[in-house]
Amino acid sequence: PIAGSMVLAAILLKLGGYGIIRMMQIMPTTKTDTFLPFLVLALWGAILANLTCLQQTDLKSLIAYSSISHMGLVVAAIIIQTPWGLSGAMALMIAHGFTSSALFCLANTTYERTHTRILILTRGFHNILPMATTWWLLTNLMNIATPPTMNFTSELLIMSTLFNWCPTTIILLGLSMLITASYSLHMFLSTQTGYPLLNNQTEPTHTREHLLMILHIVPLMMISMKPELVI
């Protein structure tokens, strides 16, 4: 059920990050080196989740693994225990909550018309549903963290935090962001470009689907313009 996936990615997954933030308040702040294995594990886990995304053929699995990679960055930022790190983690959790939920919503609109989640079978939608293609493009750009979205602000804060703590982490972060951009564009091109392989009749997009996407993207853009509401 797509509603379950949307709630899971947008809200329940963030409860783990909230729990870590609460636990860190009772931990010793000066001994970040104690948490070094967890920090390396979080960044390495983010890269492995990104690499797993690259070889997914199932659209829903791809979006689910992308959520895991973003949470790796959140955990790494929280472990550093600096104000910038916590702000970046909070911002990324909120931004990714909107983005991943929107991606699951779009995956469902595609599934309702094709009855398959295999990437190679869902191609060619830019000719059939051009407005849905616009939503796909906007959501994937948010997932890549292009400015002026909240995703960009949060990843910039996390990158600054980790770079100040240890400049070497920029290699892992850069690699993670490069792979994120790769699989996001791969997902967009696989589902929207080319010629449709399925020969069945496709329903047009409904107003409720456009409204759902507006309710995901507009609040995120408004928070991006006034980030002091959350960080």
Swiss-Prot record:
Which top-level enzyme class is recorded in the Swiss-Prot or TrEMBL entry?
translocase
Question: Could you tell me which InterPro entries the record lists for this protein?
Answer: NADH_UbQ_OxRdtase, ND/Mrp_TM
A family per Pfam: Proton_antipo_M
Catalysis: reaction(s): a ubiquinone + NADH + 5 H(+)(in) = a ubiquinol + NAD(+) + 4 H(+)(out)
Biological-process GO terms, alphabetical: ATP synthesis coupled electron transport; electron transport coupled proton transport
Cellular component GO terms, alphabetical: mitochondrial membrane
- Topological relation to the membrane, as annotated: Multi-pass membrane protein
**MF terms in GO:** NADH dehydrogenase (ubiquinone) activity; ubiquinone binding
Family the entry assigns: Belongs to the complex I subunit 4 family.
Could you identify this protein by its name?
Answer: NADH-ubiquinone oxidoreductase chain 4
Origin species, per record, is: Trimeresurus albolabris (White-lipped pit viper)
The lineage, from the top, is:
Eukaryota, Metazoa, Chordata, Craniata, Vertebrata
Gene name, Swiss-Prot/TrEMBL = MT-ND4
